[in-house]
Amino acid sequence: MNQDFEHQLSFHSNNNSNSNHHHSYNNSINSGSSSSGSNNSSNNNSFNDEIEGGEIQEEPYISSSSIRTSELDQKILFLSKDRNLSKRTGSEDPQYGSFFNTLSEPLILSQQSHQQHKKQNRDQHSSSSSSSSSSSSSSSRSKRSNQPPPLVGIAAINQQQQHLQKQKQQLQQQQIQIQLQKQQLQQQIVQHQTELQNKSTPSKTSSASSPPQNTLSAPAPPAPAPTSAPTSAPTSSSVSSLTQPQKPKSVQYSQPAPLEIREEKVDPNIKEEFENTESKISSIIQSMICPISPLRSPFNESIVYTNISSSSSDFDYNNSNSNNSNNNNNNNNSITENNTDKMINNQPSSTNSKKLKTNEIDSKDTSNNNLNGADFKKTTTTTTTTTTSSTSEPIKSPNSSSSTNSSASTTPTVKKEKLILKIPKLVVKSDSGTNKESNSSNSSSTTSTPKSKDLEEKKEKEKSEKEKGEKLEKSEKSDKSEKTEKTEKAEKTEKSEKSEKSEKTDQLEKAEKLEKEEKTEKKKTEKVEKAGKVEKKEKPKDKQTKQEKEKEKEKEKETEKEKEKKDKVSSKKDELQPIEEDKKKIGGKRKSINSSKPEFKSDSIDMDIDEPNPKSSSNYNDSDDDSENEIDKSDKRSQKKSKVESPPKSSKLSNGKDKKSTTTTTTSTSSSSSLPSLSSSSSSLPLPSSSSSSSSSSSSSSSSSSSSSSSSSSSTTSTKIKKEEPPPPPPQQPPPPPPQQPPPPPPPINPFSVSEHDKKIIEKETGKDLGSSRDRDNSSRTTNGRDSDRDRDSREGSRDRDRDRDRDRDRDRDRDRDRGRDRGNGDRGEGDRDRDRSGRSDRDRDRDRDRDRDRDRDRDRGNDRDRDRDRDRDRDRGRDRGSDRDRDRKDSNSNNNSNNNNNNNNNNNNNNNNNNNNKKDNNNNNNNNNNNNNKRDGNKDGSSSELTPKKTKQEEKLIRSQIDQIKEDAKDLKKLAKELQSKNQNECLEMYLQVGLKYLLTTHYMIEVNDPLPNIISFLSEISLFFSNTSRLALHFKDDPKASLCFKCESFCCIKMFCLKKDNLKHTRKEVSSVYSSFLPNSSSSSKSSSSSSSSSNQPANPATAPLTPNPGNPSESPSQASSSSNPTSTTPSATTTTTTTATTTPSTTATTTTTSNNNQPNTSHVNTKIAQYFKDTEDIFRGMDAWEKSILHSNIPGFHFNFFYQPYLEFIDQVKKESDKQS
């Protein structure tokens, strides 16, 4: 039976150096005559090559003109819209993959479809030859410069139409050349048919396994792996080229790098599987006949093709064409048409044995074989076509992970379709066991001789019978091999897991050792620093040298670790090589099972890994050297593209200081599930090669992975660059480690452990808390109430006890140490014992001094606390008085009656509560005595503005020396003044006045030095007496101005004494007012009325009413006396304000204390002593007021009016000197 075969190989290449030009080659091999009489028509343009002939039927899809036109429109639209195919990294279309992305432009669709329908019935005879490819490649170079950039809108459509017309004209010229080449090829086919008749099947087997007989040294065609049942077996496209290359003159190629050719021994089991080469040849012929459907994207992980079923008639053409295929050695379809003999001879024969070993090779294996094949990267201008294979498997969706074999159908149908790829080289193996016949009509089939047709029919019948017998044998062998392979793979995975676990444990132990060493070094450095602080003898140079030495040691350790890790990696490589070779032998079924979980392992990772992760999950690989060998230097843009597509490379660590961060990456299962284009074969790796050197499977996987990286980050983390070895050794495929192996858990950490650094921080904080808590207590005294004072007392008491306990413990420790030293060194001399005894006494003395200092500090703190507490209590009482004063005014009449009744009740309860009052009074007396004994603490809040902060010792010495000097000068002046007084001379008054001013200056310095308060008050009282006597002497001499100055000085001294006693007077007044609070409401109105009436009527108050009130002086006298004066000064209103406040505040405690003091009446004797003390202390203010009034009476000095309560000593002394100078 005469049949026609047609092989349409469409090329689409995109060169980055030019403006994305698309060109195509139309190649076909025609022989025999057509039985069906159908014609093959192809519409050749630069954007679409469609082969149509006979009745095109596709089992999953209904072939019709509408479906065909829709597919054509979509392809035309895509190709006309987006030409920059090498840079497309967008999301994949679920039907067309990353290549055929549908774009909606109805104008282009309508115009392009109209042009396609016009040329559908035009017969085209396609053939593959070197001249056609070379001419098309040369024309493609010329057309690159004419390629317009993609435009938008009507102008873009017009330009594209014009460009299409130009290319059509050029293609018509090419068709004429192609027809001439067809005739030459037909003659060659007749010759091969005659040669095949004379050869037997053993010669075919030898030609399949041994190197080719032709001068073209290239790997043998891939052997088919038949499957016995419709079980899951992933499909893969087969590669074949059937024409003898002819070296074109118009194309020049760069010389490829010389490669060594290795021959590997083929296993006897594999030889038995492929003894019958007729099935192999039929699969090769079948793969050439069936083109790829445009609905299937070549950029999917594996290409699924249409199912072409035909009658079970044998092919006579297989025998005629087998020698041609063996001579060409399946140089990836029509590579021989484009490449020279030198290019093809560079492929080592090692790939032949690799292809024979595998029943089904996924895209990853094909990419590895291509890497060690001919160096196609050198030919930047040549392009290759996608391999078209007719498999016995139904069409699956691009997302399907496995495809099943379908039974042979008897209807002879051929689906001839065209696919344009951007990747020039595709190496795909066909595993179809039963190759179905397909009918294709060619107008040139009539030229073949009838003898060749008869021979072909006979041989095809023989093949069909033999193939049926081979199916059963191969299926049994495949089952056995799969079982053995499963067991071997399980053992290998267990070994790899054990090795990885051992490495992890070793690395963890090393990390722990490093941490321990670092801790020890830190301890040493800390000890050195402490010793340096104590001794302060180490020089900075020594420290720097030590630090440098430590750094050098650390560097050496790190370098040693790196070396050890490198050695481990290299040893592991050697272990993995035999495993990799065994994995090459695994059958298609095993790979289909594991295809959904591909895991990749880098051959070498030069990293300083601190905490090891599984190497399968590492993202980076050091592939700098190999990438330089792979990337074509002449094509820089393709080199950049490959760098973009490849994952980021890990920068080598400098000196091993940078440690690899433990990155837990997702395994390849997530990446395979995220890629919608995954088919039965496992995902291939993106190789960093140029567009003219990478295979279509690797490029398809790279494009799909790059497109999916935008949607899922897990795919990018799982994919890795497979490091390529130099050409002489065959490519090794590392075995996949156990899937989804989690990273090792971190070493256990003790949650209760505390580092030394933390210990130091805690010690520092605890040491600071002792001082800071005191400051906090001082700052919170004014805000906290009585409860906070109580808490503070308990806290400070416990702190003091702790301090004493620590001191006693230290003393006991020292004593025990000394006893042990004395006991151990009893033979020592007396000098040593004396020395130890003196040291002990010194320590005890220091300890006692510290204890005394602490006791004094605690006493001062207690006094301050008592004074602050009293101040707070006064503030609270004043607040209560202010609120109760209005209430007392409103209810004065009712209160009078109620108070009379309360007085009777209180008299009955006085005896019961005398003891409690006595205790309180004693406590108050103790507090007053403490306040009086303080140096000058009680006057800090008073009105003595002359008080200064504490001086240093040197300043105190200077001030005290000045005090002594002033006293001596005063004595001398006093002697002179007495001598003048004995002579009744008036100059003595001036002398006495100067002496008194010197006394005032000494009091100023005494306050500066913080002398005891009683000393200052007694000294001021003596000065006041001195000035009063001087004023009397001045009156005796009838010198009124001098007398007035002396009275003013006396008033100044009395007022300053009152200011110093003011705090004590407050306390006594409060105590007396609290005692007599029950009696005050009746007398308060009278006292207020008396004070107001006296101030208004200028009448002196009755002094007899003084003992009835807590303010016995009845301060209304001072305003009356001041107002009675002829010239009231600024000091008198100030005096009135201070005294009236005391008078008004004392009766205001009635409301608060009436309820509490009813049962707490004091003892009359004790109260009388308090009142007497108060009277004595308040005499100073009245003396001062009297002296001021006398000075005004005797002489009114203009401009000499000051507020003595707040005037500094020095200012007053200067003013007095000026006035005395004026008077003199």
From Swiss-Prot:
Keywords: Coiled coil. Residues 950-991 form a coiled coil. Residues 10-48, 126-140, 193-212, 228-241, 316-338, 379-413, 430-450, 662-719, 893-933, 1078-1108, 1114-1165 have a biased composition (Low complexity). Residues 260-270, 451-585, 630-646, 755-892, 948-957 have a biased composition (Basic and acidic residues). Residues 1-67, 111-151, 193-270, 316-416, 430-957, 1078-1167 are annotated as: Disordered. Residues 727-750 have a biased composition (Pro residues). The keyword Electron transport does not apply. This is Uncharacterized protein DDB_G0284459. It comes from Dictyostelium discoideum (Social amoeba).
